[in-house]
Amino acid sequence: FATVDCSDHPKPVCSLEYMPLCGSDSKTYSNKCDFCNAVVESNGTLTLSHFGKC
């Protein structure tokens, strides 16, 4: 089971690095920062499906 540590998020600005992650909402996030910000906004309902594009 893939996990990402989002304890240092949310962040106001994310880098432009491209390391895609697939969320449990079947959306591809461009990097960990984008994904973690979405996790925080979802109040923990969003989880990581897998690394890479959905």
Swiss-Prot record:
Keywords, comma-separated and alphabetical: Disulfide bond, Glycoprotein, Protease inhibitor, Repeat, Secreted, Serine protease inhibitor
Entry GO MF terms: serine-type endopeptidase inhibitor activity
Cell compartments where the protein resides: Secreted
Residue positions the entry lists as glycosylated: 43
Primary site of residence: secreted
Residues the record marks as site: Reactive bond 3: 16-17
Disulfide bonding pattern of the chain: 6-36, 14-33, 22-54
Gene Ontology CC: one annotated term: extracellular region
Domain notes for this protein: Avian ovomucoid consists of three homologous, tandem Kazal family inhibitory domains.
Listed name of the protein: Ovomucoid
Species whose genome carries this gene: Rhea americana (Greater rhea)
